[in-house]
Amino acid sequence: FPKLERTTNPDGKRVYKTPSGAAYPSVTTVTGLHTAKGIAEWRARVGNEEANRISSRASARGTRIHSLCESYLRGESAEPDIFDAEMFSSIKFLLNDIDNIHALEDPLYSDHLQVAGTVDCIAEFQGKLSVIDFKTSSRPKDRDDIHNYFMQTSAYAVAFEERTGIPVGRM
């Protein structure tokens, strides 16, 4: 996949420049618009200091687990520290169901949707081509909580099909 130039617009949002010169907002920015209100309400409820502490800790854990998943799928050493070992071991069996990787941390863009970003993984999961996005959470979520995840993975499925001609059937 071609590299995309990644910049930040004046509002601090990620923008990707495609090989044709088009500038598209990130998939995460676009799908995050639906959760901004909920995050603002949560921040008001717990207070900014506590929200910053929780967000920072969750973001760091998510980055570490994401890196472990990527390394594991590349066949590289993936040794979690003591803090991440339990979470990583709870998802490792799912990683073993991933095969025939088409994209792993690769840039994708859609001229049709006018969005771009870096997809976590597109591969066969249990035998079906899937967009796989590594998420971490300290609590179970129901479908209403993850609507934006479906939008995000759907956008990557469209972008992947535009770039390769291969449809992705599972998100």
Cite the ranges covered by each PLM segment.
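Metal-dependent nuclease catalytic cores that hydrolyze phosphodiester bonds in DNA/RNA
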Residues: 1-116
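Mg2+/Mn2+-dependent nuclease catalytic core
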Residues: 103-171
